[in-house]
Amino acid sequence: METTTIHVMRHGEVDNPDGILYGRLPGFGLTDLGHAMAQRAADHLVSSQADIARVVASPLKRARQTAAPTARAYGLDVECDPRLIEAGNVFEGQPVNSDRSLLLKPSVWKYYIDPVKPSWGEPYVDIASRMRAAVSGVLRQVRGREALVVSHQNPITTLTRFARRQGLAHAPWSRHCSLGSITSFTFTGNTLVEITYEEPAADLVAQAADMTPGDSQAALKR
């Protein structure tokens, strides 16, 4: 039975001078360091002789830019799938790291009622469902080969927790999904047999700033 690997990559460092929670807002492309992270991933896939047959990205600019070097390396187009988009969040557009008082206003207390769902944004179950559907679609189309899928930290973390049969609710600071990281899902037929995690740009992450660094070496973007 054929073996298929779907490499799910988080985008590189984002150009966000005002330190806002950019979420699904338009714009917000990569910094020079972010572009270097994207190139590092492409070089890593080529050097490891990954048999990339498709490159699919979230429609957000930072994800498309991250996917571009790999697409060029393999002579492919970057396809977009809205199911790979960042998670919705009621605090989108606000400088939540530099002004923590925004999170303490009585008007937002209602968003903390259910952290398991979570009540401040898109439900984890919905994120897991759309990410699973997106990856399953790519799996069907690249049987016996490999693909690169570029998404965002929360969706990738939620998908990984779902695949490992862990609870979907989690603390953002615990996420093991650094900028430019690749979480690879390997299937035999339709059966998931292995999940691996790599950081081709680990040295660059240590120089980066991230709105949600998780457990990475990136600095907290303020």
Locations of regions flagged by a protein language model:
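Short glycine/proline- and acidic residue-enriched helix-loop micro-motifs
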Residues: 105-126
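Glycine-rich phosphate-binding loop signature in dinucleotide/nucleotide-binding domains
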Residues: 47-51, 138-145
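GST superfamily/GST-like fold recognition
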Residues: 153-157, 186
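Active-site signature of alpha/beta-hydrolase-fold catalytic machinery across serine-
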Residues: 69, 158-162
